Swiss-Prot record:
Its EC number is 3.1.1.96. Homodimer. GO terms for molecular function: D-tyrosyl-tRNA(Tyr) deacylase activity; Gly-tRNA(Ala) deacylase activity; Ser(Gly)-tRNA(Ala) hydrolase activity; tRNA binding. Keywords: Cytoplasm, Hydrolase, RNA-binding, tRNA-binding. It is an enzyme of class 3 (hydrolase). This is D-aminoacyl-tRNA deacylase. It catalyses: glycyl-tRNA(Ala) + H2O = tRNA(Ala) + glycine + H(+); a D-aminoacyl-tRNA + H2O = a tRNA + a D-alpha-amino acid + H(+). It is found in: Cytoplasm. GO terms for cellular component: cytoplasm. A Gly-cisPro motif from one monomer fits into the active site of the other monomer to allow specific chiral rejection of L-amino acids. It holds the Pfam family Tyr_Deacylase.
Length: 143
């Protein structure tokens, strides 16, 4: 499981012209792109959620937990693209929808259980993601 996290001033996800999830904090928030691979499970989702919630990448080395920063979760199977051969990426390392969708949901629920305000995109939908990256700060988390 991989989570590409970006520190943002704001972020929003739109599907079919409708905003389905947005974080517009007074300070900073996080945008978390979540990719799932074969062999991932609920325990990994929970541990990554905990890692993200306490990760000190906000102002003054604070975490989302410290500041109550909101988190926008967006499923992103392309985090497991394999570009070693040829010019067309392979998606074989990405878990199928039946595996990935409940694990992305479990990741978001684990964040909520920790106390996070979580917004989310729509799994499998074609989404437009708008963000204002702060820093920029972009970090890859992986278990």
């Amino acid at each position: 499981m991989r989570v590409l996290v970006q520190r943002v001033c704001s972020a929003a996800v739109t599907v079919d012209g409708d905003v389905v999830g947005a974080v517009r904090p007074p300070g900073q928030g996080l945008l978390a792109f979540v990719g799932v691979t074969h062999g991932d499970d609920g325990d990994k989702a929970r541990r990554l959620a905990e890692k993200l919630w306490y990760l000190r990448i906000l102002t003054d080395e604070k975490s989302a937990s410290d500041l109550g920063a909101p988190i926008l979760v967006v499923s992103q199977f392309t985090l497991y693209a394999d570009t070693v051969k040829g010019r067309r990426p392979s998606w074989n390392a990405a878990a199928p929808r039946a595996v990935a969708e409940p694990l992305v949901a479990a990741f978001a629920e684990a964040l909520r259980a920790l106390g996070a305000h979580v917004e989310a995109g729509v799994f499998g939908a074609h989404m437009q993601v708008e963000l204002i990256n702060d820093g920029p700060v972009t970090v890859m988390l992986e278990l």
